[in-house]
Amino acid sequence: MNNANLTFFELISPHYERDNIKLGLSRLKKVLQEQGNPCNKIPAIQIIGTNGKGSIAAYLENILFEAKKNFGVTTSPHLFDICERIRVNKKNINKTDFEKIFVLIEKKFATYQLTPFEKIICCALNFFDHKQVELLILEAGLG
């Protein structure tokens, strides 16, 4: 399928994401290096495993919010809106910021053929870097 013929919504839809899984971190590492490794120096909690990742992320998010920390969270999949996947201090990224960052990453790094999930992670890390968060909660895309 040619990406040029897809709408923005189709590019980020769950069906498109499921059908375009490419395992490995090499593409993502290269893109993040070219972006100056956003968030590289920010401590992160990575949540992995088969079940309960979303629940653990929600618990941690509530604890950090009550502690008045400045933090970023990525989760997947979203329930209603793609912007749910990227949050700072319990607030979703707004659609304008998300689309601007997503389209920029898609155009600038088209040759890497990033998956939609990888593009969203790049968006999140760039957004968190811009917001100068002090801690990250990152839910793994696959167990």
Label each region the model flagged.
Residues 25, 29-40, 65-143:
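ATP-dependent carboxylate-amine ligase catalytic core
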Residues 51-53, 78-79:
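Short active-site-proximal "capping" loops at secondary-structure junctions
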Residues 15-16, 59, 80, 112:
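Sequence-level detector for tyrosine residue identity
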Residues 49-52, 139-141:
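Conserved phosphate-binding and hydrolysis motifs of nucleotide-dependent enzymes
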Residues 1-49, 56, 62-69, 74:
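Short functional linear segments
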